[in-house]
Amino acid sequence: MGQLRDRMDADLRLRGLSENTRRLYLRCARDFAAYCGRSPAVVGTEEVRAFLRHLVDTRRAPSTCGVYAAALRFLYDVTLDRPP
């Protein structure tokens, strides 16, 4: 996820997001990539939904699930400029 991570970090910086938010969003993207076993750039909507369901099924707090959803939305809407 090296180049994609760098692009996402640059986009987060351009938006003026705090260091903590940038780290959190990048960690969310990394966790998603690890779950999928491949780059988020080649993953579709069903994998995103499956990952978010996985978070709920593993009893993550609703606020945590919301952060992951926001981070993935940023990744796809801003960095990749495409729907998942």
Regions found by a protein language model. Name each.
Residues R5-P84:
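N-terminal core-binding DNA-recognition domain of tyrosine recombinases/integrases
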Residues M1-G2:
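Intrinsically disordered, low-complexity and often Lys/Arg-enriched segments
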